[in-house]
Structures are given as structure tokens and as C-alpha cells.
Design a protein with these regions (language model features):
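Cytosolic-side transmembrane-helix boundaries in multi-pass membrane proteins
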Residues: 190-197, 203-204, 279-330
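Helix-loop-helix "hairpin" substructures at the membrane interface of multi-pass membrane proteins
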Residues: 154-233, 264
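Transmembrane alpha-helical segments in multi-pass inner-membrane proteins
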Residues: 217, 227, 231-297
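Transmembrane helix-bundle core of multi-pass membrane transporters
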Residues: 109-177, 232-233, 238, 283-292, ...
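Membrane-interfacial amphipathic/re-entrant helices at transmembrane-helix boundaries
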Residues: 1-22, 34, 48, 57-71
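Alpha-helical transmembrane segments within multi-pass membrane transporters and channels
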Residues: 62-112, 273
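Membrane-interface helix caps of multi-pass small-molecule transporters
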Residues: 27, 51, 55, 85, ...
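Hydrophobic core segments of alpha-helical transmembrane domains in multi-pass membrane transport
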Residues: 21, 46-50, 110-114, 162-174, ...
Length: 330
């Protein structure tokens, strides 16, 4: 039982990182922008959020928990949103190719994140740690996690960022399905010319969706550093965040662009990713590490094949996804 609970715990934390990225990318893609710069943006969010928290706690004699959280999340969100702004300017205003721009942003973002993350590593060391921020981000709910036995271990033994990820996913779903602004955003992603003719400012919606979506993605990066990796930034942290961000991109396809489904989808990805470590202990079956880590991508490919065979409009990507909109051609 202990191994099963440990498997669920690490899968939930792992999946929550992917969940931030998937929700952010879903908002972006709902506006018709295919942002393959997600890995770079998440890396920037992780690096700058960590550096912000580290500099705050080392420069203040008695750091405040709320301010530490505000600095870490605020820095991560703003820097990541700026990455989305760069992408929006290049693709929406200058009509650059979205695929090339996104991949370029990934290379740039990962490199920039590694550079600034390494800035706070002491000379001669390979890593550094933000102890106070880690304590805050990894703090569990005292009563619920300690007094409810197995239920507490499974549901309440996480830091606040896990629950924030759930809230963000649910709010994104309600926004896209229940609000006029969300419906306008979906209209922009499906048919920008028609949306423009109806009086919707296509450019504004694309910019806002991409910047806010990128900001949410960046929160996944800072969650990875300050909780999942126990507040440690190492020279290899940027590469690790990049790999999880690609899982987020795959998850968007897997959930068919529905943020609420990203909740269970991200946890499923987490369980599959860590199966190689826990299945041998639980049922005695040895699982190849590389094959286990491939499972989420294989599942995504199968979903793509099945959905294309069904040809249901509900299972398809936004019609204008990846396409530049030229207003003069409407």
C-alpha cells in the first residue's frame, strides 16, 4: 500500500506540472495560435521564478511567506507572459510562421532560463537551493494530511500549487464554455474572418490568450523547481523542465482541447511516466524505463488516429490553428 500511495503522490505532483502547461497551451490554441515555444516559456518561468524567490529570501533578514510566494509566482507569470508577447508579435502582427517561431522560442527560452538559473549557483557548484521558498511551496495541509490516514495521504499531502492547478483548469473550462469572452475566443480560433466581421477584435484576443496562457504555463516551471525538485536549481534543470513541457503539448492533443479533461489526463500521464519505478514493487513486473516514459506519447498518437477516424467536430483542433490571419483577405 505504501508503494501505491507513493506512486499516486509523485504522479499527482508530476501531472500537476504538466497540467499548468496544458491549460496554458489550450487557451493559446483556442485562439488559433500553435505555440510550440511552450518548453522555452515553462523553462523561463521556472528559472526566473526560482531566481526571484532566491534573491528575495537571501536579501531579506526575515522573509515573509506571502511575499515569497508573490515574488516567485509573479516573476514566473510576468516573464512567461512576456515570452508569449514576443510570440504574439511575431506571429499575429508580423505573420511569421507559427511552427518556426514556436520552436525558435523554445531554443531561446531554454537557453535564457539556463543562463539566469546558473547566475545564482555559487562558483564551483552544480546547484543551489531556495530553502525558505521550498518550505513554503512544499507545506502540506496540517490536519487533513496527518489525521485522515490513506485518504489524507492521497488527497491532501501536496503543496498549494497542486490545488491551484486544479482551480486554474476548472476556471479555464468555465471561461471557455460559460462566458461571452470565452465564446468569442473560441470563435476567433475557429474562424477569425467571421469573428472579425461580427465585431470581435481578433488581434486583441490572440494577444491576450497567448500572453495569459504563457503566464499559466510558466507557473508549471516554478512549481517544478520549488516543489517537485525540492527547491533546487541545477545545471540540468532547464532540460528537465523542457521534457515535461513537451508532455504538456502532447496532453493538449490527448484531451482534445478541453481543459477540464487535462486534470485526469495529466495524472494518467504521471502514472504512466513513473510506472517503471513502482510497478516492480507493487506487482513484481519489471518495466523498461524508456518504454514506460514513451507511453504518454504513444497514447497521444492513438488518440489522434482514433479521433481522425471518427471525424467528429467536437474532437478536432480549432479550425484556424497554426494559420495566420490576414484581415484584408476576409
Amino acid at each position: 500500500m505504501a508503494n501505491l500511495i507513493s506512486w499516486i503522490n509523485i504522479a499527482v505532483v508530476f501531472g500537476s506540472i504538466v497540467l499548468f502547461g496544458a491549460v496554458g497551451e489550450t487557451l493559446t490554441e483556442k485562439a488559433g495560435n500553435l505555440n510550440l515555444g511552450t518548453p522555452g516559456i515553462m523553462c523561463m518561468g521556472g528559472a526566473f521564478g526560482f531566481v526571484g524567490a532566491y534573491l528575495y529570501e537571501t536579501s531579506v533578514g526575515n522573509p515573509n511567506a506571502f511575499m515569497c510566494i508573490l515574488v516567485a509566482l509573479g516573476t514566473a507569470f510576468i516573464v512567461s507572459a512576456l515570452g508569449g508577447l514576443i510570440y504574439s508579435f511575431l506571429t499575429t502582427t508580423l505573420h511569421a510562421n507559427q511552427n518556426v517561431t514556436g520552436l525558435t522560442l523554445t531554443i531561446f527560452g531554454v537557453g535564457l532560463g539556463k543562463f539566469f538559473g546558473t547566475y545564482v549557483i555559487p562558483k564551483g557548484a552544480v546547484s543551489t537551493k531556495a530553502d525558505f521558498a521550498t518550505k513554503i511551496f512544499r507545506a502540506r495541509i496540517p490536519f487533513l494530511s496527518d489525521k485522515l490516514g490513506v485518504v489524507g495521504d492521497i488527497l491532501f499531502s501536496y503543496g498549494f500549487m497542486m490545488y491551484l492547478a486544479l482551480i486554474v483548469a476548472i476556471c479555464a473550462t468555465l471561461f471557455l464554455t460559460k462566458t461571452r469572452t470565452g465564446l468569442n475566443l473560441r470563435a476567433v480560433g475557429e474562424n477569425p474572418a467571421t469573428a472579425d466581421a461580427a465585431g470581435i477584435n481578433v488581434t486583441k484576443y490572440k494577444y491576450l490568450a497567448t500572453c495569459i496562457g504563457s503566464g499559466i504555463t510558466g507557473l508549471g516551471g516554478v512549481y517544478y523547481i520549488l516543489d517537485y525538485s525540492k527547491g533546487t536549481w541545477a545545471t540540468a534543470s532547464g532540460t528537465a523542465i523542457e521534457s515535461l513541457a513537451w508532455l504538456s503539448v502532447a496532453l493538449v492533443i490527448f484531451i482534445r482541447w478541453r481543459p477540464v479533461h487535462a486534470i485526469w489526463g495529466s495524472y494518467l500521464f504521471g502514472l504512466c511516466y513513473w510506472a517503471y519505478q513502482f510497478l516492480p514493487k507493487i506487482i513484481g513486473i519489471k518495466v523498461n524505463t524508456d518504454l514506460a516514459k514513451m507511453i504518454p506519447y504513444v497514447i497521444t498518437i492513438l488518440v489522434l488516429i482514433i479521433s481522425s477516424m471518427r471525424k467528429s467536430k467536437d474532437n478536432q483542433a480549432p479550425a484556424s490553428l497554426g494559420l495566420s490571419y490576414f484581415r484584408e483577405e476576409r
